[in-house]
Amino acid sequence: ILFKMITGKFPSLRLRRNRKNDWSRRLVEENNLSSNDFILPIFLIDGKNKKQPISSMPGVYRYTLDKLCSYVEKAIKNKIPMVALFPYTKTKYKDSFGTEALNENNLVCKAILEIKKRYKNNIGIMCDVALDPYTSHGHDGLIKSNQIVNDETIETLIKQSLLQAEMGCDVLAPSDMMDGRIGK
């Protein structure tokens, strides 16, 4: 009878007993989140000695490269395995082609190099693959004649991905929404 209660079907199998008490729910729960499951987003800003609040996200800040490492150290101390980097690009670096995304001295590339130099492989780095931080029009896709040119955009995204990987990025996270961007 016990075997049927464990492996059988209703009405022999009654799983409500697993949900009856707090201790039993905790015992059989599928997921148990820990800091090992988190990725810490870090928003970057050019300059020195800045921790700039982001008004649309209370309690969240943009950090300059000189402030970045103290924030990364907190992540490592709290056993967060990875950071995700997101740049805030000054208008003077933006153009309609997202050229700054391909600059090996852009903010994200500098941050990757700094984190890898200081922390080696003690923390992973994820980077957003997208052009919107770098385009003057704010779209992920390149625009010609008021249309997104998907295939040309993909070529630029490939170059951006390769650059981030060459700098030491561990995980590429494409968010651009272009058709066919994976697998080319």
Which positions does each model-derived feature cover?
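Asparagine-rich low-complexity intrinsically disordered tracts
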Residues: 1-4, 70
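Compositionally biased, intrinsically disordered low-complexity regions used as flexible
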Residues: 4-5, 133
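N-terminal amphipathic alpha-helix/helix-capping segment at the start of soluble metabolic enzymes
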Residues: 5-50
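Alpha/beta enzyme core
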Residues: 37-39, 46-184
